[in-house]
Amino acid sequence: MTSTADVFDKKDQFNFVFPFTAIVGQEEMKISLLLNVVDPKIGGVMIMGDRGTGKTTTIRALVDILPDILVVKDDPYNSHPHDVDLMSSEVQALVLNRMNIETCYTKVPLVDLPLGATEDRVCGSIDIEKALSEGKKSFEPGLLAKANRGLLYVDEINLLDDHLVDVLLDCSASGWNLVEREGISVKHPSKFVLIGSGNPEEGELRPQLLDRFGLHAEIKTVKDPELRVKIVEERTEFDKDPVAYIRKFSKSQDELREKIINAQNLLPKVEMPRELKFNISKICGILDIDGLRGDIVTNRASKAYAAIQQRNVVEIGDIQKVIVSCLRHRLRKDPLEIIESGEKIQKAFTNIF
C-alpha cells in the first residue's frame, strides 16, 4: 500500500495534488465522496455549486487517500486477478486455462470525461472492416474501460448529451459496458463511481437522470471572512512549497486512508435496526418521493457512514448526516414553495425521529 510519504519517490507524482485532509469546509461534498468510496453501490454523486468552490480540487484530492488496487499487469481494463466480475474476457480465459498472470498494485484510476467526447471515445470502438475481413473482433477500449474499478469524473455534467449521461449511469449501475456495432458485440467490466459536477446557473439535469445519482451535494461559496482568509492562506502555502505542504498533512492523509480501508472491511457487518428502516421509508412517503431509490440509497449511505465511524450498528445520527444528500434531488419541484429542499427534509426527519 502506498503511503503519502512514498509519493516523493515516484517520478509521476510531480504534478502535486492538494491534500484532501487540508481542504477547508465543504463537509457535505467530502462526506458524499467518502461514502461512495466505502460503498460504490450507493450510485455516485452529483455535486452542484458555484464556480471556484473547490469541486474539482476535492475530487482530484480524493484519489491520493484511496488504497492502491491489485490489477493484472498491462491490462487495459484494470482487471482484478481473482474476482471474475472485474475481469476482462481475455483475463478470464487465462484464469480458466490456469496460466500464470502477472499482477501489480496501482493507484485507483481517475478518468476525466471531456464534454466533447464522442460515444466511441467513451464506450470504445469496434473495427468492423477487420472483423469482416479477418473474422477477428478488434476492439479499441474507451474511457469506460480505463475507469473500471476507479472514478469517472464529468465536469459540467449538466451540459453533457443526455444519451451519454444515460450510458454512464447504466454502466455505473450494472458494472458492464456493452458495445454493439453491425451485429458484432463486445462486453467488458466497467465498475466505477460516477462523479458529476456543475453550476446550477447553467441548467439542471433532467429529473429522470438526476434521480439515478445516489447522492446530491450542494456547494455554496464560503461567506465567513475568517474561513475565506484561511482558505486563501492554505492555498498560498501549498503553491509556495507543495512538497513541504504535502508532508505537513501526510499523517492525516495516511490516517484517513486507513479509516477508509477499515470502513470497507466493516461494511458487510453493519446492521440497521428495522425501526430505523421503517422510519426512513416513512420520511420518503411523507416527502412524496417517487420510486424506492431514495429508501435504498439512504439505507446504504447510513450504513457506510456508520462503518466510517467504526460502528457495526446504524444510529439515528448516521441517518441525519446523510439523508439530505440522499433525498434532495428526488423531491418534486414546486416553484411556489419558499422552503429550501434541505430544510424540508430535515423538518420531515425531526417530525419522524
From Swiss-Prot:
Entry keywords, A to Z: ATP-binding, Chlorophyll biosynthesis, Chloroplast, Ligase, Nucleotide-binding, Photosynthesis, Plastid
Gene3D superfamilies: Magnesium chelatase subunit I, C-Terminal domain, P-loop containing nucleotide triphosphate hydrolases
E.C. code: 6.6.1.1
EC main group: ligase
Major place of residence: plastid
Domain of life: Eukaryota
Name of the protein this chain belongs to: Magnesium-chelatase subunit ChlI
Native species: Cyanidium caldarium (Red alga)
Gene from which this protein is expressed: chlI
